[in-house]
């Protein structure tokens, strides 16, 4: 690292603006200092760096080149922090190409892919992506005009853009996998608890692993690395709309009836 630059404890590389901010918010809410960067070279002292590559809709080769270029400005390869590749939970984008480029740039030989986001209805079952109980190839995401999803099998999608071996794995297998040759493992997850176990296994691994996932895995890392509990939020919401005032007047003139259900 250059003199005067503090190495982050977590580095997130997202492929779009929304994903970058999602990841940053999750980690900021539990006490991390977070910087979201959109241009290189970037230098900062936050504990979490979130880099937006804005490469989701790019040609795969150009997306890989963008990742390589971004990482060349971040001197982390010799001793990388926890590195998260933030992807879309519905598998849109250049997942395989960007995973390979990031692994090479960070000197990491293993990647764990867990794109599930249970809170949004996105789960991984038997290596396939499901959305609200429907296989993703049977949803509107299959016909996305920019980045259509061609298969429900996550490993198949990744293999379209990389020659690195990719296959389903389990959390228990992570501690036994070889680090001599590059590999990519896809892990099932249907609940936040599943993602918590995946995040814990990656963060405790004997050698650095690339953690690949959506907002769900970023939330799991936030829970695992929390510096302080999320703050209580009070929202006070008002409206200057004339329609709101009219509705309030109607409500004030409308009789209110109370029924004691204990007598029913």
Language model segments and positions:
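Cap/lid and interdomain-hinge subdomains that line or gate substrate/regulatory clefts
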Residues: 2-9, 34-37, 47, 63, ...
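Residues that scaffold, gate, or flank divalent-cation-dependent active/transport sites
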Residues: 24-32, 40
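Structural motif
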Residues: 11-13, 48-52, 112-114, 184-188, ...
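Soluble secreted/lumenal catalytic domains
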Residues: 31, 206-208
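Short, structured active-site "lid" loops
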Residues: 50-67
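Short gly/pro/ser/thr-enriched loop/turn and capping motifs at secondary-structure boundaries
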Residues: 41-43, 118-122, 217-220, 242-243
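Acidic, glycine-rich loop-and-beta core segments that form the ion-binding/anion-interacting portion
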Residues: 209-256, 260-264
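Short glycine/serine/threonine-rich phosphate/pyrophosphate-binding segments
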Residues: 19-23, 94-95, 195, 220
């Amino acid at each position: 690292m250059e003199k005067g630059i503090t190495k982050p404890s977590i580095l997130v590389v997202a492929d779009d603006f929304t994903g970058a901010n999602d990841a940053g918010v999750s980690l900021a809410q539990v006490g991390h200092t977070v910087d979201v960067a959109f241009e290189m070279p970037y230098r900062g002292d936050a504990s979490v760096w979130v880099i937006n590559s804005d490469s989701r809709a790019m040609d795969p080769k150009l997306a890989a080149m963008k990742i390589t270029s971004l990482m060349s400005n971040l001197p982390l390869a010799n001793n990388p922090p926890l590195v998260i590749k933030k992807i879309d939970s519905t598998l849109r984008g250049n997942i395989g190409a960007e995973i390979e480029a990031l692994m090479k740039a960070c000197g990491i030989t293993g990647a764990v892919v867990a794109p599930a986001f249970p809170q949004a209805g996105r789960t991984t079952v038997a290596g396939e992506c499901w959305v609200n109980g429907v296989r993703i190839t049977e949803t509107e995401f299959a016909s996305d005009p920019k980045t259509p999803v061609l298969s429900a099998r996550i490993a198949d999608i990744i293999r379209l853009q990389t020659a690195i071996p990719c296959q389903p794995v389990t959390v228990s297998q992570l501690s036994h996998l070889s680090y001599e040759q590059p590999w990519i493992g896809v892990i099932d997850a249907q609940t936040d608890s599943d993602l918590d176990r995946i995040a814990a296994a990656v963060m405790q691994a004997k050698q650095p692993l690339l953690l690949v996932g959506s907002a769900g895995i970023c939330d799991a890392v936030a829970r695992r690395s929390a510096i302080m509990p999320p703050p209580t939020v009070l929202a006070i919401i008002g409206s200057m709309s004339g329609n709101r005032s009219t509705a309030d007047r109607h409500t004030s003139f409308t009789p209110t009836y109370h029924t004691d259900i204990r007598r029913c």
